[in-house]
Amino acid sequence: MGKIIGIDLGTTNSCLAIIEGGKGRVIENSEGDRTTPSIVAYTKDGEVLVGAAAKRQAVTNPKNTFYAVKRLIGRKFGDAEVQKDLDLVPYKITQHDNGDAWVATADGKKLAPQEISAKVLEKMKKTAEDFLGEKVTEAVITVPAYFNDSQRQATKDAGRIAGLDVKRIINEPTAAALAYGLDKKGGDRKIAVYDLGGGTFDVSIIEIAEVDGEKQFEVLATNGDTFLGGEDFDKRVIDYLVDEFNKDQGIDLRKDPLALQRLKDAAERAKIELSSSQQTEVNLPYITADASGPKHLNIKLTRAKLEALVDDLVRKSIEPCRIALNDAGLRTSDVQEVILVGGQTRMPKVQQAVADFFGKEPRKDVNPDEAVALGAAIQGGVLAGDVKDVLLLDVTPLSLGIETMGGVFTKIIEKNTTIPTKASQVFSTAEDGQSAVTVHVLQGEREQARFNKSLAKFDLAGIEPAPRGQPQIEVSFDIDANGILHVSAKDKKTNKEQKVEVKAGSGLSDSEIQQMVADAEAHREEDKKFQELVQARNHADGLIHSTRSAIKEHGSKVGGELIGRVEASLAELEAAVKGDDKNQIEAKSKTLEEVAQSLHMAATAEQQSASTGAGAGSSAKVDDVVDAEFTEVKGDKK
């Protein structure tokens, strides 16, 4: 069995870890960084850039550079959270045929968020393969604890498109607890994991216990907000900068994608700087221009101002903490330790708010950027048998049930139920002689079905006609360890049964996934060909440069006919380099190498000939000296 890698697929950054010698290890990417920006860009020449390379060119290619797509994964275009983002990102968010939120490139090509995420996962997969020296096909991928079924399914689909068999979907706070608690001694304890990442927020209350020599991690309760994170903090800074500039110059920068991308980068930098300093300056020369000429943005931002801008966001993260504690039946004094996860928790105001709520300082010995990936790797190690004596008991974050008469949401599995789990309930018909029922599966906490997330609808036909209320329809829910739901409905009299693995009404169909897998494979081949083309061009450029230098140095010493041949070969190679035919470039390179070799040989021969001619007058003297030395040696022997 090969390695099962652990991947933290983050909104802003992603991280990869493996188990090595029984311990988790974060693997650096090809740029030498321990985290990779979750950014994918499509260039004009068709190249796909991922990570730091995509981030570097974002300012000059804003409409084709996609970031924070995790906020869109598994969501409908009409969702309020998606609508809120429409004018705040420089790229286009569009509606797919099934109502899902997709993105589109500047030339109109539509892409599913799963496809974008798959590009990031592919980079993680390649990083692992380069490090391990073997093929990697299996992974544990983390998701926010508060992700619903659609979002979990979509994340698995992204893994599949990237060529990964996702062995387990694991909640981010639970993964962080695994990374933190695996080697810790000190008996049973309850911890709170406060996870404020780039795009999502979760809090989980977890009990770590020793049971018969086995370390057990049991999630007691979880809560959160899948649309609250560092991106929202950045947006507050962007809005402030835009409003200040508008007041000063009368120009709204929101309408300029290029300016918006520059503002995003500057806002993120300013926010990070203010975690360690009291004041920073946002300086963006030539941010825009009007009839009077170019305009420059120069605004001072203090830590106090930033904290005022995001105060409600920080407070918004505390309410889920209160709910999670209440669901777990605990008080803040029952929590022994608080762990911070996610880059946004580096902000002093966030740390203070958490300390004030829980009544204790959060721990600082957990790396907020790496803990989740390490936990995913540990879970992979458990599944592969590399890590022993660890039991993870996670929960479902939201209640699951069906719509019943009058539009009521009837819960079958309550939120915070330990998974995997099964539950069933018996229902009946609403009308006399009814021969079929529609089972509408929902997820959420509202009493009215229409306010909850619709996961699936299916029909159970073949019910024996009878007066209303008499038929007995048993509806069973089965949640697997990934938090993914299977539902069945059975007529207890006829034993007619209908089973479904819940595939959200949104999400990708099998044929779409297969097409994307094929596209990804083709793209991998394209990438390989592109790399080969670049190598051929680079070799040709080096050859052109060295040959031009040789002509400059030796051109006057060799025949005009040879120089003519070299110049002709040079021109042919320079023309080939401008094209995309690797074979042509290599063939012309070979021709130039051969004539350049002739040039080198001719120049060397000419040099030797000149050297021989210059030394002819002194050759006799040299011979005499040699003979004299030879004679003297002979004379000595006599």
Swiss-Prot record:
Against InterPro entries, the record matches this protein to:
ATPase_NBD, Chaperone_DnaK, Heat_shock_70_CS, HSP70_C_sf, HSP70_peptide-bd_sf, Hsp_70_fam
Sorted UniProt keywords = ATP-binding, Chaperone, Nucleotide-binding, Phosphoprotein, Stress response
Q: GO MF terms on file?
A: ATP binding; ATP-dependent protein folding chaperone; unfolded protein binding
What residues bear Phosphothreonine in this entry? 200
Which protein family is it in?
A: Belongs to the heat shock protein 70 family.
Q: Tell me the function of this protein.
A: Acts as a chaperone.
Official protein name in the record:
Chaperone protein DnaK
Per the UniProt record, the source organism is Xylella fastidiosa (strain M12)
Name of the coding gene: dnaK
